């Protein structure tokens, strides 16, 4: 299962009661963070989650409201006695940008391993996370992310016996290991059926609606998408500033066939997003106005 927390929902600047947009997930003891604006570490503390377990930090782009909180977070992670390396993922220029921010956090008790995304779409596997970065349409290079948790096929004892797999290897093979024993190589597909549907989360902020968002979000269990503007009369602002309205995000969710939509990254002038949800739900009924620390646990389909 995948624990998901929308740490903040504000765009451009933090507001009283609304931190800057960021997402955190937990999976098998490993945490992943997408974006880290001013105050993100406070939002993590308010949620009661730990800095220590953050193994992966992804950045959508390098505007200040998405990255300015990184030095403080890194210092807090160091103070939490973290020593394991942290993987940092982001668009081209990642190491240069992070190095500049680290002027105030030059010494850390852990390494930063940088993965710069340069292609329109790239897949990165870290721990049990399958991370897919995809280019979106903002006024700087910007990426959305899908986070997938793969699920193995069902264990089929008859298949294991037919393939003469020793019983003592069954457990390790079910965990995805490949084992060499007595001059034979045993692989998971010798005891498992077809791969089952896993968990899929899609996160997209700072973009105009583009086809690749629909493509990447297809069938997501949860789609977290920016809704900078709820007011229909601000459609021109959305176009000019390369953002989205609630209604454009809802249309993306509808076309992608997602199960649930959470809106986020609200304009500072948008103080009551719930007032615009009635018309949003007319487009996509399972749309919800994101709130700081809104959380859910996504689980595997028990019928699979």
UniProtKB/Swiss-Prot annotation:
Reactions mediated catalytically: Endonucleolytic cleavage of RNA, removing extra 3' nucleotides from tRNA precursor, generating 3' termini of tRNAs. A 3'-hydroxy group is left at the tRNA terminus and a 5'-phosphoryl group is left at the trailer molecule
Molecular function GO labels: 3'-tRNA processing endoribonuclease activity; zinc ion binding
Taxonomy of the source species: Bacteria, Bacillati, Bacillota, Clostridia, Lachnospirales
Binding note for cofactor: Binds 2 Zn(2+) ions.
Active site residues according to the UniProt entry: 65
Gene from which the chain derives: rnz
EC identifiers of the protein: 3.1.26.11
Signal peptide (from-to): none
Protein name: Ribonuclease Z
Quaternary structure and partners: Homodimer.
Cofactor: Zn(2+)
Alphabetic keyword roster: Endonuclease, Hydrolase, Metal-binding, Nuclease, tRNA processing, Zinc
Family listed: Belongs to the RNase Z family.
Function: Zinc phosphodiesterase, which displays some tRNA 3'-processing endonuclease activity. Probably involved in tRNA maturation, by removing a 3'-trailer from precursor tRNA.
One Pfam family here: Lactamase_B
Binding site for Zn(2+) 2: 65-66, 206, 265
Sequence positions that bind Zn(2+) 1: 61, 63, 138, 206
Originating species: Lachnoclostridium phytofermentans (strain ATCC 700394 / DSM 18823 / ISDg) (Clostridium phytofermentans)
């Amino acid at each position: 299962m995948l624990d998901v927390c929308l740490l903040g929902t504000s765009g451009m600047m933090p507001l009283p009661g609304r931190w800057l947009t960021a997402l955190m997930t937990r999976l098998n003891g490993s945490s992943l963070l997408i974006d880290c604006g001013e105050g993100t570490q406070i939002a993590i503390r308010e949620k009661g989650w730990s800095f220590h377990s953050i193994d992966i930090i992804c950045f959508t782009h390098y505007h200040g409201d998405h990255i300015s909180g990184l030095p403080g977070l890194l210092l807090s992670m160091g103070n939490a006695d973290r020593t394991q390396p942290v993987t940092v993922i982001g668009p081209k220029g990642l190491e240069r940008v992070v190095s500049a921010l680290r002027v105030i956090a030059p010494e850390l008790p852990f390494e930063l391993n940088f993965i710069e995304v340069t292609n329109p779409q790239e897949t990165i596997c870290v721990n049990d996370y399958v991370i897919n970065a995809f280019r979106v349409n903002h006024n700087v290079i910007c990426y959305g992310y899908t986070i997938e948790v793969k699920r193995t096929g069902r264990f089929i004892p008859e298949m294991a016996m037919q393939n003469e797999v020793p019983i003592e290897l069954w457990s390790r093979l079910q965990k995805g290991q490949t084992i060499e024993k007595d001059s034979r190589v045993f692989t998971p597909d010798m005891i498992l059926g077809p791969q089952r549907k896993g968990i899929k989360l899609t996160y997209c902020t700072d973009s105009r609606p583009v086809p690749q968002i629909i493509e990447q979000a297809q069938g997501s269990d949860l789609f977290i998408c920016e809704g900078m503007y709820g007011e229909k009369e601000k459609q021109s602002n959305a176009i000019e500033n390369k953002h989205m309205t609630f209604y454009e995000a809802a249309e993306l969710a509808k076309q992608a066939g997602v199960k649930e939509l959470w809106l986020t990254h609200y304009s500072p002038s948008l103080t009551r997003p719930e007032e615009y949800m009635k018309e949003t739900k007319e487009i996509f009924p399972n749309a919800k106005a994101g709130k700081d620390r809104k959380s859910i646990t996504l689980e595997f389909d028990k019928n699979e």
